[in-house]
Amino acid sequence: MRAQPKHYELKLHDVTLLVHEWEGQGDPILMLHATGFHSRCWDQIIMLLPNAHIYAVDLRFHGASGAHGNVDWQLMARDIEQLIDSLDLQRVLGVGHSLGGHLAARVAAERIERFRALVLIDPVILPRDRYDTAPELATMTADMHPVSRRKNQWRDSDEMFERFRNKPPFNNWQPEVLHDYCAYALVEVPGESYLELACDPLHEAAIYLNQAGNNKIYDLLPNLQLPITLMRAPAVDAAAINLSGSPTFEGLIDLLPQGKEIYLPHMSHFIPMEDPELVAKTIAELDAQTSASGIG
């Protein structure tokens, strides 16, 4: 069992990010979480990689990191670039889920000299034609999106766990992962007896809606000349708001020159939460292939 990580606040140009570091051997692994979550959702996976040197960060607008500025995916990508520079990370194995997968691909393409490989877990890299609807989404305000109406007053993390454990999609998660999510998902509200979500539901909704400019990822994909493992769940009707379906372009693997796809038809978008053992095994295998020491 791994020791608890070191954690520290990393001050960037206009925001402070909370970083967790599990010290270990070999080249670093950097983990980026999905929209609405936080870095400690990786804990069960990290425990299965006992010797690896791992960094996990709360993205801007999430967890204990700052929420300064307007929601913008490019802004969050720049945060990760600055984090890599500030910590002087070299030969990074980037691991990203959903939003984190998009950011990992984008940052690696822009800063390829810092990366050795990627594990992209159901990344939000939409089919090209879906980005054509970005102007339509931009006309919808965050308070119009269903996730903006999430329950946002909680007694404690135990109440949250009990409420979610038998409800989709959480009922398909490993209980330990759900516990980790709930344990770090809430923050105190000054002057109030209840807790609120660390990721404001309005910020979460705005992230889903703000796809403008994200089609740039297709211009960057040719830069990804490095080993990539793509884990993908089944897609759903693009017209439906279903956060359990895969947002990933089904033909993405054909655009990744050194890509290997693991298609998981029996799973939902929440692959790391449903099968942390599989994700840890996938990371360890790619780490062994690309790290000088081959640890995992």
Cite the ranges covered by each PLM segment.
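Alpha/beta-hydrolase fold catalytic core
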Residues: 1-29, 50-53, 89-90, 125, ...
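Conserved loop-alpha-helix segment in the C-terminal half of the alpha/beta-hydrolase fold
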Residues: 222-267
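Active-site loop/oxyanion-hole signature of alpha/beta-hydrolase fold enzymes
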Residues: 55, 59-95, 281
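Conserved HGGG/HGGXW glycine-rich cap/lid loop of the alpha/beta-hydrolase fold
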Residues: 18-66
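A catalytic-pocket lid/entrance helix-loop region that shapes and gates access to the active site
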Residues: 121-154
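Hydrophobic, aromatic-rich cap/lid helix
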Residues: 175-219, 235
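Conserved hydrolase catalytic core segment
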Residues: 90-134
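Catalytic histidine-centered segment of alpha/beta-hydrolase-like enzymes
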Residues: 264-276
